[in-house]
Amino acid sequence: MSGRVLDLFKPFEAYLPEVIAPERPVPYKQKLIWTGVSLLVFLVLGQIPLYGIVSSETSDPLYWLRAMLASNRGTLMELGVSPIITSSMIFQFLQGTQLLQVNMENKQDRELYQIAQKVFAILLTFGQAIVVVLTGNYGKPSDLGLAISLLLIFQLIFASFTVLLLDELLSKGYGLGSGISLFTATNIAEQITWKAFAPTTVNVGRGQEFEGAVIALFHLLAIRKDKKRALVEAFYRENLPNMFQVFSTIGVFLSVLYLQGFRYELPIKSTRTRGQYGSYPIKLFYTSNTPIMLQSALTSNIFLISQILYQRFSTNPLVKLLGVWGTRAGAPAGQQVALSGLSYYIQPPFSVTDALLDPIKTVVYVGFVLGACALFSKTWIEISGTSPRDVAKQFKDQGLTINGKRETNVYKELKKIIPTAAAFGGAVIGALSVGSDLLGTLGSGTSILMATTTIYGYYEVAAKEGGFTKNLVSGFSEMM
């Protein structure tokens, strides 16, 4: 693609909804207010059901993507942040691979790049809204009728436009951090909180039990005469959240928080000012949660395509090779899961017992996740502008060099460290995800990791802008 491709999007500028950037820095307290308001609007949208649905009780084809996309089925947040994330990742890929020439130091190029991203996100919103309705997620289109189908599409588009503007509001400096990260982490945290403290009751065949694991613990201790049996039931009950999952979630959260503090301090010095030294931190999670996001996106899309093909061509041998789908014990209620084929082997086990019963599948799954995360992490540094060559260029532009090394050797030294750190960090975050899935946390391993890294990122932003400098990770490490 030529750089002139961006000029094709210039006519759209006058017609796109836009949040005007603040003329002066927004005070920290006002940022907190705007962030809170944006979050409140998002949460409200996620609780309002779509008007006109005939039925949404079928197996959810987007089940594996919901947490990552901040999506709630059957609500205005059906699409979540999917159009924005998809558009952003595609354009970042095009830019990183030089298929789209963009000079980010040029204001006009930067603005056109943002316009192009927004236009593509809007097109995706229209496309996804139409597909979701016409594929029968809310009932057969013939049963819904033209008027209701159009109304459903309009509701989905309206909600997605609102999320797009909320994200832009925060990203342009009115709030803290990125709206996409905030909404995704909040959606995950909301689901975890609900599973831990839900006051609703469910009939499990032996009577009514509370859905929330913590509330169920106290309820069982109160009504059971045998307290030991009540504790065992509260910690290991099946098909409902249990206390073992609660403690597993807390353990994973603290582990990720602790590992955030692991970094290699690369000694650097200034080539312009004599005697000025410092360090360049290379974190263990050098690419943050991007590897597990990409791995999750890959597997989720394989699952989605496999399910759609199996529904239509269930007798085709090639389709069966990709995945055979159905319900089984231990799986989420009413949700179709892979029973054989490629999809089965890259699908996480539902429990430690499930993993032990099929060791070959477990080994393949673990190898796939660790390998994919390491590969994605190593590839992402080239796309995102954090590769050894990019960092070496930054050093040169800022008049920095590695202490004890010549300026001409900076790239070689960085090439020894950064790709290894990225691949190892990706494998570690993949291992944490696998561990989370095997332990059975309240939510998938991917969602727990995404929420934890995002929350810590927000803590760092708040610490920087709020004027307090206490490092949460170092403080936690001291306690450990």
From Swiss-Prot:
Signal peptide: none annotated. Residues 1-32, 97-118, 167-245, 384-416, 460-480 are cytoplasmic. Gene3D superfamilies: SecY subunit domain. GO terms for cellular component: endoplasmic reticulum membrane. InterPro entries: SecY/SEC61-alpha, SecY_CS, SecY_dom_sf, Translocon_Sec61/SecY_plug_dom. It is found in: Endoplasmic reticulum membrane. GO terms for biological process: protein transport. It is a multi-pass membrane protein. Its main location: endoplasmic reticulum. Residues 54-75, 140-145, 267-362, 436-441 are lumenal. Keywords: Endoplasmic reticulum, Membrane, Protein transport, Translocation, Transmembrane, Transmembrane helix, Transport. The chain crosses the membrane at residues 33-53, 76-96, 119-139, 146-166, 246-266, 363-383, 417-435, 442-459. Heterotrimeric complex composed of SEC61-alpha, SEC61-beta and SEC61-gamma. Belongs to the SecY/SEC61-alpha family. Appears to play a crucial role in the insertion of secretory and membrane polypeptides into the ER. It is required for assembly of membrane and secretory proteins and is essential for cell growth. It interacts with other membrane proteins required for protein translocation. Upon binding to SEC62/63 complex, secretory precursor polypeptides may engage SEC61 to begin membrane penetration event. A cycle of assembly and disassembly of SEC62/63 from SEC61 may govern the activity of the translocase. This is Protein transport protein SEC61 subunit alpha. The lineage of its organism: Eukaryota, Fungi, Dikarya, Ascomycota, Saccharomycotina. The gene is SEC61.
